A protein has these predicted regions:
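C-terminal helix-loop subdomains that flank or include functional centers
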Residues: 279-284, 289-298, 311, 318, ...
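Extended, regular secondary-structure scaffolds
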Residues: 123-126, 130-131, 136-237
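Extended, charged amphipathic alpha-helical segments
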Residues: 217-350
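Short, hydrophobic/amphipathic alpha-helical patches that form generic packing surfaces
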Residues: 78-86, 128-135, 245-263, 433
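Extended, helix-rich architectural segments
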Residues: 1-155, 464, 468-469
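Short amphipathic alpha-helical segments
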Residues: 101-108, 114-122, 129, 246, ...
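Short secondary-structure junctions and interdomain/linker hinges
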Residues: 28, 42, 87, 115-123, ...
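A short, surface-exposed helix-loop junction/capping segment
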Residues: 103-109, 298-302, 352
Length: 469
């Protein structure tokens, strides 16, 4: 009897089964700890009462200390996700040449990705993966007759991603060879104003679902559901640390530096009046012309406060540079971008080379994830269209992650034309469609051809008229 069969033995108490399934096979940081760095409102400076003490006035009023918190970790997660997936992942299909059935299958796979909104799903998965360190995407079918995939299908294929960011605890279970034998997850759901905890497990042939009753009692929601795919209908990915690991001390130093300086500015921003000599009488407030009288050549003036701002600016700028340098991500703030001016495509590539290397470093785990996900989709497609079952596995799918860069279309087109011997790389109809201005490109092309023909005829007539004179 294998390990997972032993764990899921129906004669065992459900609480023991779930306890064994919660024995996580991988070491992933607790999201509750990473959240303290990811969420700016949970940073140390927000609750620090030791080094950031509030001032209590003599009248009992509390003057709160400045607490400036920065969401640099959240920004870093968004930025690396955007660099990885702002340009949608491209799929290249091999071994489909001169085989119409395989070409139809590739179109069906692309349609599955399209109607599952995979591009926006990748953005969500990227944010969750780089911040909370693990994701699990489950694929499932809903009964909905359609022709979205190029054939009459009774079902529509959809996907849903779970991660600790959504309050879901993931429990993958691997065997000694590193193959996943079970995937479990625990989540809470409100039912009639009561929060109920559910625990689900997927194996290669069964789907189990339990709900919690009381503190340690569990009951089955339904009988185990058979999985006809003969494999877990989902994919799991994890990383050993969040993308911002080791950078929190830099962000913390920036927060404390700015907060301390904010207190200094607040203290010294009120006008300070300097009086030299003895003041005679009182100055009446509210008068249009204010008069101060002083004895023995006295003087009165406002004292201007001078702050050594350059040292502070240098310190904060250096820390910001260190933060993004160690993260291997560029600081794409508006201030930095406007100083670059109108640089060429090659210069942009050079500037972003470190970020592209970082995406290349991270892409290995993603490519593996996408390949396993594609295999799950293929298995579903075999069931949805049995006439394709013998050909689906013959198609090879290559996933290409393109790091973000602003393209120079003129340079790209000129380079492609040069490689094409100086000839056009788009037909007239294709260029009209790409421009996007015409609501009916075919009609526009027909009109352009008519106008060209009329102009050519006018030139011919002009030549003959000049000759007859």
């Amino acid at each position: 009897m294998d390990e997972i069969t032993t764990i899921l033995d129906s004669t065992r108490p459900v609480s023991d089964i779930i306890s064994d399934l919660k024995e996580k096979s991988v070491d992933v940081p607790e999201w509750s700890k990473s959240l303290k760095d990811y969420d700016p409102s949970r940073h140390k400076i927000v609750t620090d009462k030791f080094s950031r003490k509030d001032k209590i006035r003599s009248d009992g009023r509390v003057e709160p200390a400045s607490r400036i918190h920065l969401g640099l970790e959240k920004l870093l997660v968004k930025r690396i996700t955007e660099f990885a997936f702002a340009i949608p992942v491209r799929r290249v299909y091999h071994n489909t040449e001169e085989n119409k059935k395989r070409q139809q299958i590739t179109k069906a796979i692309e349609a599955i990705y399209k109607y599952a909104r995979i591009d926006s799903e990748n953005i969500r998965r990227g944010n969750a993966y780089f911040a909370s360190c693990e994701i699990f995407t489950i694929w499932y079918v809903v009964e909905r007759p359609n022709t979205l995939y190029g054939f009459n299908s009774k079902y529509k294929l959809k996907c849903k991603t779970y991660s600790p960011m959504d309050g879901v605890r993931l429990y993958p279970l691997f065997d000694e060879w590193g193959d996943m034998i079970a995937m479990s997850f625990e989540y809470k759901k409100k039912i009639k104003d009561k929060e109920v905890t559910f625990f689900e497990t997927y194996t290669a042939d069964r789907h189990y679902k339990w709900k919690q009753q009381g503190e340690a009692s569990w009951i089955a929601v339904t009988d185990p559901e058979r999985i006809i795919l003969k494999k877990i209908p989902g994919v799991y990915a994890y990383r050993p640390a969040p993308i911002f690991h080791g950078l929190e001390h830099i962000r913390e130093e920036i927060e404390y530096t700015l907060s301390r300086n904010s207190d200094v500015i607040a203290y010294n921003s009120a006008p300070l009046l300097k009086v030299t000599g003895e003041l005679v009488g009182d100055e009446d407030k509210g008068e249009a012309r204010r008069l101060f009288r002083l004895k023995n050549g006295g003087d009165i003036a406002y004292v201007s406060w001078t702050q050594a701002i350059e040292a502070l600016k240098y310190h904060v700028d250096t820390l910001l540079k260190l933060f993004f340098m160690q993260a291997q991500m560029p600081d794409l703030s508006f201030e930095n971008m406007k100083s670059l001016g109108n640089i060429g495509f090659d210069a942009r590539q050079m500037i972003l080379s470190d970020a592209h290397l970082k995406i290349g470093d991270e892409s290995g785990a993603w490519i593996e994830f996408f390949e396993r996900e594609c295999n799950v989709i293929k298995e579903f497609l075999k069931m949805m269209n049995t006439s394709w079952a013998d050909e689906i596995d013959n198609i090879e799918v290559e996933h290409v992650i393109t790091p973000f860069i602003q393209n120079d279309e003129d340079a790209l087109i000129n380079r492609c034309m040069k490689g094409n011997g100086g000839k056009a790389i788009f037909s007239q109809l294709e260029s009209i469609k790409m421009a996007g201005y015409s609501s009916d490109p075919e009609k526009s092309l027909d009109q352009i051809q008519k106008e060209d023909k009329a102009a050519q005829q006018a030139r011919i007539n002009s030549v003959f008229n000049e000759g007859s004179e």
